[in-house]
Curated annotation (Swiss-Prot):
InterPro entries named among the record's database cross-references: Cu-oxidase-like_N, Cu-oxidase_C, Cu-oxidase_fam, Cu_oxidase_CS, Cu_oxidase_Cu_BS, Cupredoxin
Localization per Swiss-Prot or TrEMBL: Cytoplasm
Gene for this chain: mco
Annotated TM spans: none
Biased composition (Basic and acidic residues): 1-25
Family designation: Belongs to the multicopper oxidase family.
Protein name (record): Multicopper oxidase mco
Organism for this UniProt entry: Staphylococcus epidermidis (strain ATCC 12228 / FDA PCI 1200)
Protein keywords: Copper, Cytoplasm, Metal-binding, Oxidoreductase
Coiled-coil regions listed: none
This enzyme's EC code(s): 1.-.-.-
Length: 447
């Protein structure tokens, strides 16, 4: 027969179990901010056939809410990290740099590699130190991820921003969407709590698993997704510290479940709901071709909106725009401004073009984790024609001959450029302080 002491202990245990299983209320996304997608990490192949990457764990600042900057962590940036795209058979070499003020490791979650380079707690890289690892990819296509794994600071470092995706790309042809950032979309779902609109792990930490009240997708608060009327592939990662997700579409539409943690299924499954545990990945394909302006949402537990999805029609001009020959990426704010990652160098010619030759330039104002700002882009010595903005016909006030085009963060335009004279000309942001801080390049026009 149970005595009173044992009965009291069991009652307390039951209360604790109930408490541990409770989910903190998660507020729905208001759908105010378009999500952005992590950049794809660049690699260089060396003479031994290795693809060389560099990943740097570093401190940063992120404006989750306007004019409120949080201290965050990121790989090669302020928050999260670039996507590594690998293929089966690739030989890979990665320089790992710790620019934090505490120990960290680089763990390759789901990657089947030698334990010496797995990045567990015993493989610490001290502050200010670096090391280089090598491995060969020996598994089929899958969506994996990388994150720190130091003891005892894994939870804190992941919560503050250290996460990134690693793709082993499709090894065989299939009909799944594969255009990164267009219809093949990396979706990192996390939950966090903000204190006075700022991230503060120490004030929100829970030893039984930290859950937040605010949903983020790819580091964006109140996220939304605008997609074309076509099939889209969502590579879902539950990057939360502790929250389980039960995901479905708000209109109860079915979708194709095509891949689990370990890779693609032999046969896709038609489902209406999936569970996603912390660190788990699943890939689904949603058919938006019949939406015709309808709005749906990816929801958790039937009610909490994780990601509103709205529809934009396919461009009627698809295929009519000539091939792009030059790409311009405008990035940054203040004195951290660049064009294609470079500061102006008077001794460097960035592009060349033939006299009287029509070329199409693609101008992109990159929206980063700080949000970015509008940049007016100017080319010397010519007048150009705006062909499209974000794949659509340009607005009426952008038509006619122009020498300046102003783009909001995240916007991308195509312009037709012809030079009628030879020589070396400048192209730059026409915010004068940005120009003087190096947001400028040179093009040489020859016969």
């Amino acid at each position: 027969m149970m005595n009173m002491k044992e009965d009291k202990k069991n009652t307390m245990d039951m209360k604790n179990m109930k408490h541990h299983d409770e989910r903190k209320k998660l507020n729905s996304s208001q759908g105010k901010n378009e999500i952005i997608f992590p950049e794809v990490a660049e690699s260089k192949k060396d003479n031994n056939g290795y693809k060389n990457y560099t990943l740097k764990a570093q401190e940063g600042k992120t404006e989750f809410y306007k004019n409120n900057f949080s201290n965050t962590l990121g790989y090669n940036g302020n928050l999260l990290g670039p996507t590594l795209k690998l293929k089966k058979g690739d030989k890979v070499k990665i320089k790992l740099i710790n620019n934090l003020d505490e120990n960290t490791t680089f763990h390759w979650h789901g990657l089947e590699i030698n334990g010496k380079v797995d990045g567990g707690p015993s493989q610490v890289i001290k502050p200010g130190k670096e090391k280089t690892i090598k491995f060969e990819v020996n598994q089929d296509s899958a969506t994996l991820w990388y994150h720190p794994h130091p003891s005892p600071n894994t939870a804190k470092q992941v919560y503050n921003g250290l996460s990134g995706l690693l793709y082993i790309e499709d090894s065989k042809k299939n009909n799944y969407p594969s255009n990164y950032g267009k219809n093949d979309l990396p979706i990192i779902i996390q939950d966090k709590t903000f204190v006075s609109k700022k991230l503060n792990y120490s004030k929100t930490k829970d030893e039984d698993g930290t859950q937040g009240d605010t949903v983020l997708v790819n580091g964006i608060v109140n996220p939304k997704l605008t997609a074309k009327e076509e099939k889209i592939r969502l590579r879902l990662l539950n990057g939360s510290n502790a929250r389980d997700l039960n995901l479905k579409l708000s209109n109860n539409q079915s979708f194709e479940y095509i891949a689990s943690d370990g890779g693609q299924l032999k046969n896709a499954k038609k489902l209406k709901e999936i569970n996603l545990a912390p660190s788990e990945r699943k890939e689904i394909v949603i058919d938006l071709s019949k939406m015709k302006g309808e709005k749906i949402s990816l929801v958790d537990n039937d009610k909490t909106v994780i990601l509103p999805i709205s529809n934009k029609e396919k461009s009627s001009n698809k295929g009519n725009t000539p091939k792009v020959s030059k790409k311009i990426k405008l990035e940054g704010m203040n004195d951290h401004v660049t064009i294609n990652g470079n500061k102006f160098d008077p001794n460097r010619i960035d592009f060349t073009q033939k006299l009287n030759q029509k070329e199409v330039w693609e101008i992109e104002n990159v929206k980063d984790k700080m949000g970015g700002m509008k940049h007016p882009f100017h080319i010397h010595g010519t007048q150009f024609k705006v062909l499209s903005v974000d794949g659509e016909k340009p607005p009426k006030d952008m038509r006619g001959k122009k020498d300046v085009i102003s783009l909001e963060p995240g916007q991308k335009a195509k312009i037709e450029v012809v030079f009628k004279n030879t020589g070396t000309y400048m192209f730059h942001c026409h915010i004068l302080e940005h120009e003087e801080n190096g947001m400028m390049g040179q093009i040489k026009v020859t016969n």
